[in-house]
Each structure stands twice: as structure tokens, then as C-alpha cells.
A protein has these predicted regions:
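Hydrophobic residues in well-ordered beta-strands that form the structural core
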Residues: 67, 90, 115-117, 226, ...
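Contiguous beta-strand/loop segments that form the cofactor/metal-binding neighborhood of enzyme cores
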Residues: 182-256, 284-293
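Predominantly a Rossmann-like dinucleotide-binding segment in NAD(P)-dependent oxidoreductases
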Residues: 121-198, 202-204
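Beta-loop-alpha module in the N-terminal Rossmann-like domain of NAD(P)-dependent dehydrogenases
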Residues: 16, 46-105
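N-terminal Rossmann-like dinucleotide-binding module
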Residues: 1-45
């Protein structure tokens, strides 16, 4: 079994604790968070794990270190783990400072330890199936992608404990959600370049973005359009459409997968009873492969860096035209 340490025990860390305990290949041996209540909450899912006295002790206990802390300390913990010979599985983003993240990626590569980033759709059925359909020609010529994300409030209710998500310094929907769909788009269409972007912020300048719009393109000129907004009475909407000349594919809410040949989108399967469990198990299955040196589908740290560069460009309103 893979002895695993979890650092950062908010909602994402707690979910990972729950699902790693369920998985036969992992043993959660140590937990750490600066908030004692978060440690207690995670320990309810992994009662056999030790709540470490500090991050250093937690890192020393495991062979794999999972990091779900806010972005700012992520580099420090990742390098401490990797230089100690531990495999590292990170939540995204790698950070918020691009040069610091470039340095992190270079130094992680130099250690030679297994590393991956938890873009949650990487090992999922939708990305796997759409990739196969595109390669088989079932979609015709790929024609780009549309990303639409809207929320009545940000952060979402289930993220209330992660207060940093509401601030521009580390949070916001672009880093937290749109990044997943940019990763997905690059996996299918190839590397993207930011053409133009606009991000709007509330009058209280330390809060995160409320609206974003952007256009990105592949080297061949295929467009990826992004629209995100917060506000108004509406349900959450998280949607990626990969467009083809014969058929298009749409992924909604991270797990609903549908196909259109020009008519209404038709679901490929009923909604699963527990989509999060299916997604996390797929990620963990591939993490086992990666640690064993086998081929895997998880996001690499290089892919995560590319996404971070795009995200920070969108948030800054950068692009070819600026």
C-alpha cells in the first residue's frame, strides 16, 4: 500500500481522505493543517491516520504527499516532499506567481520523483472518450471549444470554509474552475495561446473576479472562447463544448457527457449515483500506475504550468492585443 500524507484539510483534503481510505492501494498515515478543526474533520474520514505536529512531520511520515493547501505555501511543501524522495500529488494551481511556478516545475523534475496535478477530469471517461472519438474521426474536423461558467455566488456554499477563494490574490472561479476546462481543451486541441482577455473585479479591490471573457487559439487557429460570470438568481453552470464538423461533445458539471449531431445534446448515459466517487477513483487508479512507473492519464506539472500561465493572463487581461 502507498503510505500517504495529506496536507491542507479543507473540503478538498477531506474528500481525498475519504476516497483514499476507500481505495485498496492507499494508506492515509498522516494529516496536517494549521486549523485544528480541519484536522479533526479529516480524521473522521481517516481515523487511523496520525494528526502531525507540523507539516515537516507529516511529510516525513508518507511515501506520497498530497497537497490541498492554498496556493501560496504549495511550492514550499512540494519541494520539501520531493527533495525527501516522496511522490507529490498537488491540487491546482501550482501557484499564482508564474516565475515561482516555473522554478517549482524545474526543481521537481530535477528530483526525479513522480509528480502529478489533480485536474479531476484527466483520467475520467469523458476526456478518454472524446479523445478516442476525435482520433477516430467520429467528430469530423475539430473546430474549437466553448467554456461557459456561471454562478449565483462565489465561492459556492460548499466552499465557505475556504475563505481565500473569494480573494483575488489566490482565489476566483478562473483559477478554480475554468482552469479545469482549459486543461481539457489543451489535451484535445493542443497548446493554446491567449489572444485577448477581459476580467472585471468588484469595487473592493482585494476580492476576486466577477466576470471574465477571453479568446484563445491553437497554433492552427482553432478558437477556444471563455465566458464566466457571478451573480443573479441562477443555478451553477459549468460547461465545456468541444466542437466538430460532424458531431460535438459537451461536458456539464464535470460529469454529464452529451453528444450533438446538430440537434439537441443527447446524454450518453444516466447520471451516476455518486459522480465524485467515480472521478476520484479514476484519478487514484492512475496515480497508482504513475507511482509504479506505468503509463497514466494524470495532468503533468508541465501541463499545469501551461494552464497557470493562461489563467494568470486572463485575470490580468493580457493577450496578443495588449
Amino acid at each position: 500500500m502507498i503510505k500517504t500524507t495529506l496536507i491542507g484539510l479543507g473540503i478538498m483534503g477531506q474528500r481525498m481522505a475519504e476516497h483514499m481510505v476507500r481505495h485498496p492501494a492507499f494508506e492515509v498515515v498522516a494529516l496536517w493543517d494549521p486549523d485544528p478543526s480541519a484536522c479533526d474533520a479529516a480524521a473522521a474520514f481517516a481515523p487511523d491516520a496520525v494528526i502531525a505536529t507540523d507539516a515537516e512531520a507529516a511529510i516525513a511520515a508518507g511515501d506520497l504527499v498530497y497537497l490541498a493547501c492554498p496556493p501560496a505555501p504549495r511550492k514550499t511543501y512540494a519541494l520539501a516532499a520531493a527533495t525527501g524522495g516522496k511522490a507529490v500529488f498537488l491540487e491546482k494551481p501550482l501557484g499564482v506567481d508564474i516565475e515561482q511556478s516555473r522554478d517549482l516545475v524545474a526543481r521537481l523534475h530535477a528530483t526525479g520523483v513522480p509528480t502529478a496535478v489533480n485536474f479531476t477530469q484527466a483520467a475520467g471517461a469523458a476526456l478518454t472518450d472524446i479523445s478516442a472519438s476525435a482520433q477516430a474521426g467520429e467528430m469530423g474536423e475539430l473546430q474549437g471549444a466553448d467554456i461557459i461558467v456561471t454562478y449565483p455566488h462565489w465561492p459556492r456554499a460548499w466552499q465557505a470554509g475556504a475563505d481565500w477563494l473569494r480573494f483575488a490574490a489566490e482565489g476566483g472561479m478562473t483559477r478554480e474552475v475554468i482552469s479545469h476546462f482549459l486543461f481539457f481543451s489543451e489535451r484535445l486541441l493542443g497548446p493554446l495561446d491567449l489572444v485577448w482577455a477581459q476580467a472585471d473585479y468588484p469595487a473592493q479591490s482585494d476580492l476576486c473576479e466577477t466576470h471574465v471573457a477571453a479568446r484563445l487559439e491553437t497554433a492552427e487557429g482553432l478558437p477556444v472562447t471563455v465566458m464566466g460570470s457571478v451573480g443573479g438568481a441562477q443555478p451553477d453552470r459549468q460547461e465545456l463544448t468541444i466542437k466538430g464538423s460532424k458531431t460535438s461533445r459537451r461536458v456539464s458539471e464535470f460529469y454529464r457527457y452529451a453528444i450533438s449531431d446538430g440537434g439537441p445534446y443527447t446524454p450518453t448515459a444516466p447520471d451516476p449515483a455518486d459522480p465524485r466517487a467515480i472521478s476520484l477513483k479514476a484519478q487514484l487508479d492512475d496515480l497508482v500506475l504513475h507511482i509504479a512507473g506505468e503509463p497514466h492519464r494524470l495532468a503533468t506539472i508541465d501541463e499545469a504550468l501551461r494552464v497557470q500561465i493562461l489563467v494568470e493572463g486572463i485575470l490580468a487581461g493580457r493577450g496578443r492585443t495588449t
